[in-house]
Amino acid sequence: MEISFTRVALLAAALFFVGCDQKPQPAKTHATEVTVLEGKTMGTFWRASIPGIDAKRSAELKEKIQTQLDADDQLLSTYKKDSALMRFNDSQSLSPWPVSEAMADIVTTSLRIGAKTDGAMDITVGPLVNLWGFGPEQQPVQIPSQEQIDAMKAKTGLQHLTVINQSHQQYLQKDLPDLYVDLSTVGEGYAADHLARLMEQEGISRYLVSVGGALNSRGMNGEGLPWRVAIQKPTDKENAVQAVVDINGHGISTSGSYRNYYELDGKRLSHVIDPQTGRPIEHNLVSVTVIAPTALEADAWDTGLMVLGPEKAKAVSYTHLRAHETVLDL
């Protein structure tokens, strides 16, 4: 199903976004106190803003959130050798490999959006990510050779991965023994959506939850207004706001090349790898922000658009996202 109400921000200036719990002007109604819970997961931070819950409920909820996120990390991590994902990666078997419904859904969404971005969003790019030192392995001491890059590219490709649904059981199947799936590009989005489902299960209908750069929300904030997200430029000394958007009931995610990088042989190397070249991206698009029905979808789309660069990303967003607004800040 196409996304008919997505807003895409394609920015050639560095961006980040934070949840806004307050209206930019005084509220006309009595405000409800917003409790903010925070913690760590997946090498990043999580946050939940919830109006109108007491201290006892907050403590109980924080424990449930952390437990769930720890389980998500155990499902998706490439840093934990005993994670569900790494057990699949380490297996040389070409037979269907049983996985959870959650894993199958994440991979299905990733493959779908990967196809719509002409392979730019590629969850099999892990060998290249590791080669360039952005995975569990250490950074290289020199720029990888073309031979090394080609060898790793031969182990990648969305066409080598299939999701199978049979008799209430889901499977992943690869046709390359060394295929390595890396879900770090969509893990935060999935976890944010999972937190939103936890809020619903707990009877909470007003919340803003985030994991890393992915957010999901529902209902009104403490001022009785829709949740709003400020998109800012971290390179701006004044932290000027690029845009403020309402995300009520939607997911939002950002991908950027400005935070996770290192310099080697005089070159600045981004963690965003282009599956076509096998190298870090070199274009001038620094960040992409996407609003979509779910944070998982937004997380997948922003990665693909980030890889494509400003011109191709703009074309793809209009073709597949039917975007309401595209912003280029050059």
For the regions a language model picked out, list residue spans one by one:
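Mature catalytic core of soluble alpha/beta enzymes
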Residues: 2-5, 17-322
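Single conserved hydrophobic/aromatic residue that forms the stacking wall/gate
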Residues: 320, 327-330
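Bacterial N-terminal signal peptides
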Residues: 9-16
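Intrinsically disordered, low-complexity repeat segments enriched in small/polar residues
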Residues: 6-9, 329
